[in-house]
Amino acid sequence: MTGDWISKITHSGLKSWIEEVIALVSPDDVRLCDGSEAEYQQLCQQMQDAGVMTPLNPELHPNCFLVRSSPSDVARAEQFTFICTKTQEEAGPTNNWRDPQEMRAELHALFRECMRGRTLYIVPFCMGPLNSPFSLIGVEITDSPYVVCSMKIMTRMGASVLAMLGSNGTFYKCLHSVGKPLAPGEKDVAWPCDPEHMRIVHFQDDSSVMSFGSGYGGNALLGKKCVALRLASYLGHQQGWLAEHMLIIGVTNPEGRKKYFAAAFPSACGKTNLAMLMPKLPGWKVECIGDDIAWIRPGNDGRLYAVNPEFGFFGVALGTSETTNPHALATCYADSLFTNVALTADGDVWWEGKTTTPPQGMIDWKGRTWVSGGEPAAHPNARFTAPLDHCPSLDPQWNNPQGVPLEAVIFGGRRTETIPLVYEALSWEHGVMMGAGMSSTTTAAIVGELGKLRHDPFAMLPFCGYNMAAYFEHWLSFATKGLQLPRIFGVNWFRKDEHGQFIWPGFSENLRVLEWIFRRTDGEDAIAHRTPVGYLPTAEGLNTSGLDLSEDALRALLTVDAQGWKAEVSNIRKYCSIFGADMPQRILEELSRIESELK
């Protein structure tokens, strides 16, 4: 076993943790990752030799690879995701709670000798710009070269992070294994995993993560959802900041004035499409800072500032096309990994919605010849992993260690009725109620839940690392700190008519909604009118010029459906009852206000 990693680590706490893990998991070899391009290429070559990775046609996708996972390891596994806090009360009713001591014992049994026959990789990573007051350092120990390569794209990773950590910095311990030890001479499978014993566990007492049995994105790239949301939200609650499941964009109007917005949507509701929106309206510009996670802190001037802690995109491929998101296709043109997409005869990738006609002679995501009219060629949760700086609409402030000031926070979901196209909260408290009441039709990003309506407060249901009622209270507390808070808005691109057709054209036309939000943050009063559920655009207030949208359709999008809203309020109140006495009274008061005003 190579011991040269020891000489490169000056942090005694990190050194002793690594030694502890090695003793527990018994790897054949140990490797400290430096994050270099040479290391990345060597690991990609190793995976090609093992039949795990397929290089794409370099003329179509330079330095890109396709990976196929096991069909039993294709999405975030919420039923195996646990939050361990001293008391169950601290984790709250929306999290799977386990006693930390019991869970540690269970995991130690699973991890014992689990890396036999494999290489243990030490992956130092930084969430957030290097040397930013926002940033957190983690070290992931993993036995998956796919994870190492993905972490190079998704995080700032390697020697520079180790240097920043120094000999006494704080770091988050992240231990990951695919859970498939190899006996001497045993041949490995292309995608090792152990679905029966899958565990993704967060220990809030020492800010550590242990993940076993899955090699898939959110379960295995522990910097992403585990550190940047579940651990960071807990930390933010203690320290007075927010870790949110939000995109961050810069919107510039034709006069050249720019504002930054953050927006929360549940998985697969168009976050990446909005983050990379290509405006059709002349003179407008939308630039991307991130498409998934925002860390938000009060700045010295009293405004809220946001950074994207990530370094890459882990985007849903399905439906991404030159029409829906040309910037996403440009982003993953080179230096990207594709997981569970189809492979075309000429060495390109394909997924449903990429083109109207599927190419002939494809290999599907399970490695079989694809048959037209049969199963989908790509898995519905197929992904591209692409570098942030490859995005053609990347905002110049993307790496600013201080973050960017937010003027609007937007909440959205996939709702076919009741919820208007856009509306503005009457107050911060009303806005927090809007976030707490979010619900959406579910998608393939979550195992076993396709097509149901589920509550997803702030789009944080799977990612909040502590009691959600305390999280709502934390959001409310920002109104008492004398801050210059962003305005809060709700949007819904997904209303349908009586024929089941989407009313709003969506995609690049969503800029028209951003334009209204932009003007509202400028204090334009004439473009909105007050209703019980918030400020809605007046008929003339929303720019619909050049849109094929009838007056009836516009009315449907911008009218308060009193009966629908009464049902909505009652539904939210019923959901909030799961939090019992912990539920903040201010949110319940907002629900009562809406109800009484609707009468």
From Swiss-Prot:
Residue sites binding GTP per the record: A268, C269, G270, K271, T272, N273, R383, R414, F507, S508, E509, N510
Amino acids binding Mn(2+): K225, H245, D292
Active-site residues per Swiss-Prot or TrEMBL entry: C269
EC number: 4.1.1.32
Assembly information from the UniProt record: Monomer.
Designated name of the protein: Phosphoenolpyruvate carboxykinase [GTP]
Annotated family: Belongs to the phosphoenolpyruvate carboxykinase [GTP] family.
Cofactor requirements of the protein: Mn(2+)
UniProt source species: Chlamydia trachomatis serovar D (strain ATCC VR-885 / DSM 19411 / UW-3/Cx)
Keywords: Cytoplasm, Decarboxylase, Gluconeogenesis, GTP-binding, Lyase, Manganese, Metal-binding, Nucleotide-binding
Gene Ontology biological-process entries: cellular response to glucose stimulus; gluconeogenesis; glycerol biosynthetic process from pyruvate; oxaloacetate metabolic process; propionate catabolic process; response to lipid; response to starvation
Catalytic activity as recorded in UniProt: oxaloacetate + GTP = phosphoenolpyruvate + GDP + CO2
Residues at which substrate binds: R76, Y216, G217, G218, S267, N381, A382, R383
Keyword Metal-binding: yes
GO CC entries: cytosol
Pathway: Carbohydrate biosynthesis; gluconeogenesis
Annotated InterPro entries: PEP_carboxykin_GTP_CS, PEP_carboxykinase_C, PEP_carboxykinase_GTP, PEP_carboxykinase_GTP_C, PEP_carboxykinase_GTP_N, PEP_carboxykinase_N
Location (main, coarse): cytoplasm
Record's cofactor remark: Binds 1 Mn(2+) ion per subunit.
Taxonomic classification: Bacteria, Pseudomonadati, Chlamydiota, Chlamydiia, Chlamydiales
